[in-house]
From Swiss-Prot:
GN (gene name): trpF
High-level lineage: Bacteria, Pseudomonadati, Chlamydiota, Chlamydiia, Chlamydiales
SUPFAM superfamilies with a match to the protein in the record: Ribulose-phoshate binding barrel (SSF51366)
InterPro entries from the UniProt entry: Aldolase_TIM, PRAI_dom, RibuloseP-bd_barrel, TrpF_fam
Recorded catalytic activity of this chain's protein: N-(5-phospho-beta-D-ribosyl)anthranilate = 1-(2-carboxyphenylamino)-1-deoxy-D-ribulose 5-phosphate
HAMAP family: PRAI
Enzyme Commission number(s) from the entry: 5.3.1.24
Name of the featured protein: N-(5'-phosphoribosyl)anthranilate isomerase
Enzyme class: isomerase
Length: 208
C-alpha cells in the first residue's frame, strides 16, 4: 500500500512524513489553492526528504508542458500529478521524464466526472472528491473504479475512515491531505501522519 501525503507546505512537515513512511510527498502549484507553494519553498521541501525514500510529487492542474519542465528542473521534483485539458498531449511529452499521477474527479454520489483517457498502468490514477479540498469522501459504496490496476483513493481519507475505504475498495494506495492536518492551519500533524500511514500499511497487509 503506497501512501501519498499531499498539500505539503513546509519542509519540516515533509521531513516528518518521510520519517513516518510516506512513499510520496505532494506539493501543489495551483495558484488558487490555499496550499500552493512557490518554487523556492518546493526546493526546500525536496531537500528535506533527500535522505529518505519518499519521492517528491508536483501537482500541476493546468500548467503547460514548458512550465512543468521548468519548475521540476528548478526544484528537483521527480514525479508529477496532472489533470485538466490536453492531458494526452502532456502524457506524450512528459511520460519519458517522470512518474505520472492522473486525477479523476468523483462526484459526491460516487460517479466519476469524466471517462478515463487511454493510458497504461505505469500511470497512477488518483480518485479525488470533486472540488478537491472539501475534506469529505465521496460515496465509496456506490463507487466503482475504472479498469486500471494502478490507482489511489483520495478525497476525504482520514484516520477514522481509512479502514472502511480499504475494506470496501482495496486500492493500491491512499492519497491524503486535509485528513492529516492540524485544525485551523495548513500544517500537517505528525501524529496523525504516523497513525494513518501505519494503519494503511497494516490494513493492506491484512487484505492480501
Amino acid at each position: 500500500m503506497k501512501v501519498k501525503i499531499c498539500g505539503i507546505t513546509h519542509p519540516d512537515d515533509a521531513r516528518e512524513a518521510a520519517k513516518a513512511g510516506a512513499d510520496y510527498i505532494g506539493m501543489i502549484f495551483a495558484k488558487d489553492s490555499r496550499r500552493c507553494v512557490s518554487e523556492e519553498k518546493a526546493k526546500y521541501i525536496v531537500e528535506a526528504i533527500q535522505e529518505g525514500n519518499s519521492e517528491p510529487v508536483g501537482v500541476f492542474p493546468e500548467h503547460s508542458v514548458e512550465e512543468i519542465l521548468a519548475i521540476t528542473e528548478a526544484t528537483g521534483i521527480t514525479s508529477i500529478q496532472l489533470s485538466g485539458e490536453d492531458i494526452l498531449f502532456k502524457f506524450s511529452q512528459l511520460r519519458e521524464h517522470f512518474s505520472i499521477f492522473y486525477v479523476v474527479s468523483v462526484y459526491s454520489n460516487g460517479q466519476p466526472s469524466a471517462a478515463l483517457p487511454p493510458m497504461n498502468d505505469a500511470v497512477t490514477v488518483v480518485y479525488d472528491h470533486i472540488g478537491g479540498e472539501r475534506g469529505s469522501p465521496f460515496d465509496w459504496k456506490a463507487f466503482s473504479p475504472f479498469q486500471h490496476n494502478n490507482w489511489m483513493l483520495g478525497g476525504g481519507v482520514n484516520l477514522w475512515n481509512i479502514k472502511e475505504g480499504i475494506s470496501l475498495l482495496n486500492p493500491r494506495g491512499i492519497d491524503v491531505s486535509s485528513g492529516v492536518e492540524r485544525p485551523g492551519i495548513l500544517r500537517k500533524d505528525i501524529f496523525l501522519m504516523q497513525a494513518l500511514i501505519n494503519s494503511a500499511k497494516e490494513l493492506s497487509s491484512s487484505t492480501l
